[in-house]
A protein has these predicted regions:
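Active-site microenvironment for binding and transforming phosphate-containing groups
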Residues: 1-282
């Protein structure tokens, strides 16, 4: 079912899915209203071993391809989406947004090719497509419209600075404009998954200055750190998002590296957890 009115205020809660009781963070009220399932996975519930243990979803980190494919399948099975085609981009810390506006096999092949060429956000304007992006400290962002359209973005500090999530929201709003008007983004729910928090994100003075110049002093908590969530939220507000509709998981990946992958905590060798969104066709 797709909502025609206002979405419920976003809330991120922990749940276990499927026969394997796979843990993930989600919003059940959103799913009940729109049919859109959003999920932030952790590192438990998969088959990978060593530094990738166990639910590694990234195929670019040194884990075995068969393990990654099995882990991705386990996630879709647990979320009751085993039959939903999956699109996973090659993330490049850029600002390219790939729009998924046709679920036909030919269009999906073209979209996958575009995503594999390098993209850090996917915008799905039709049902029947699942989007997965992978993370280990960077900021996962999922935006959902009352129409059931959605966007998933990967924002490292460069992506936050360059506004990749805001760019995805603007693309989503263009798709919604005929139904929801020019201020469509004001009614979107935004979900921010586990990421490196300000207390663990120490940067050089040059990066702090760039963030302060771009987003204001609210994202600079002290003379050593940058608050990526605050900077991201400022950028999303510029794209029309209501700050009251931005829900943060409240989890720092560095501090919680036993539950989520953290590049910084692991010293560079680790798996990737995921941000997943889909709406089934029919």
């Amino acid at each position: 079912m797709v909502a025609t009115g206002q979405l419920p205020i976003p809330q991120i809660t922990a749940r276990r899915f499927g026969a394997r009781c796979l843990p993930a963070l989600t919003d059940d009220a959103l799913y009940e209203r729109t049919g859109v399932r959003v999920a932030f996975t952790g590192r438990a519930g998969g088959v990978s071993e060593g530094p990738y243990s166990s639910l590694n979803l990234g195929n670019h980190v040194g884990d075995g391809p068969a393990s990654v494919e099995r882990n991705r399948a386990l996630v879709l099975e647990a979320l009751d989406a085993a039959d939903v085609p999956l699109v996973v981009p090659s993330q490049v810390h850029g600002e390219v947004v790939v729009e998924l506006d046709d679920a036909s096999p030919e269009a999906l092949d073209a979209a996958r090719e575009a995503a594999l060429a390098g993209a850090d956000a996917l915008v799905a304007t039709v049902p029947g497509i699942a989007a997965l992006l992978c993370f280990a400290d960077c900021v996962p962002v999922i935006a959902v419209s009352p129409t059931g359209r959605f966007a998933v973005a990967h924002a490292g500090w460069r992506g936050v600075e360059n506004g990749v999530a805001a760019k995805a929201v603007r693309a989503l709003a263009r798709a919604d404009a005929a139904e929801l008007g020019e201020d469509a983004a004001n009614g979107y729910n935004v979900y921010v998954g586990p990421h490196i928090h300000a207390s663990c994100f120490e940067t050089g003075a040059d990066v702090r200055k760039r963030f302060e110049d771009r987003f204001g002093s609210s994202c600079i908590p002290d003379e050593r750190h940058v608050d990526l969530l605050e900077a991201l939220t400022v950028g999303l507000e510029e794209a029309g998002i209501d700050r009251a509709r931005v829900a943060d998981a409240g989890v720092c990946t560095v501090c919680s590296c036993d539950e989520f992958f953290s590049y910084r905590a692991a010293g560079g060798i680790c798996g990737r957890h995921g941000a997943v969104a889909f709406r089934k066709a029919g």
